[in-house]
Amino acid sequence: AYYAEKIPQYDEDIRAGRRKLISYKEIRKAIFEVVEKYEIKVVCAHNSRFDVNAVNITQRYLTKSKYRYFLPYGLEVWDTMKMAQSVIFKQKRYKEFCKENGYMTKNNQCRKTAEILYRYISGNNEFIESHTGLEDVMIEKEILAYCFRQHKAMEKVLYPAPLPKPIEEEDIYCFEDYLKYL
């Protein structure tokens, strides 16, 4: 899954027009626009702590820590790994599936990767996760849907949305200032 191993594939996809290379600034701007346009209140990923940390660290690096957070303020972050912990990992059938297929950790715990969860819920034990963005999102949405179909109480939230922050005039200027860094 290491990124450097994917570079030839990304290069080919960019040349073929299947992917577009854009700046970090453009990515963040697009996310803000989509969140606002569709009034999105929640984002979700498998092991979302990794993703949130990665984008925040990149944000801090690029702006020399002047701007610390990548996602829009007030957006709640859900984690399908937490959800699966509540509703899938407790299933006797999932535990048997992991044991039968050698999907156990050295501490004899069932592994919790999106790839293994997708193998379990899809019945496709040959599935290999591509770790290339959109393709991964497509399996993570299946994990999310599967968790909701269980109709059980589950922990979802990585970070609850904070109370709405009043918009100050200085915030508008800060965002314009931020754009200079990218």
Task: List each model region and its residues.
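Non-catalytic, well-ordered alpha-helical scaffold segments
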Residues: K29, N53, W78-M81, M138-K141
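Glycine-rich, flexible loop segments associated with nucleotide phosphate handling
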Residues: R19-S23, I27, V42, Y69-E76, ...
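Acidic two-metal-ion nuclease catalytic site recognized across multiple nuclease folds
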Residues: K99-Q109, Y120-I121, F127, L134-L182
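Hydrophobic residues within well-ordered, non-membrane alpha-helices that form the packing/core
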Residues: V35, V55, Q59, A84, ...
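Short helix-to-loop capping/linker segments positioned immediately adjacent to catalytic or ligand/cofactor-binding
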Residues: E39-A45, S65-Y67, N125-H131
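Substrate-recognition/cap helix-loop segment adjacent to the acidic, metal-dependent catalytic center
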Residues: F50-W78
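Conserved non-catalytic scaffold segment of RNase H-like nuclease domains
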Residues: A1-T58, E115
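Active-site-proximal helix-loop-helix substrate-binding element of RNase H-like nuclease domains
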Residues: A1-R15, T80-V137
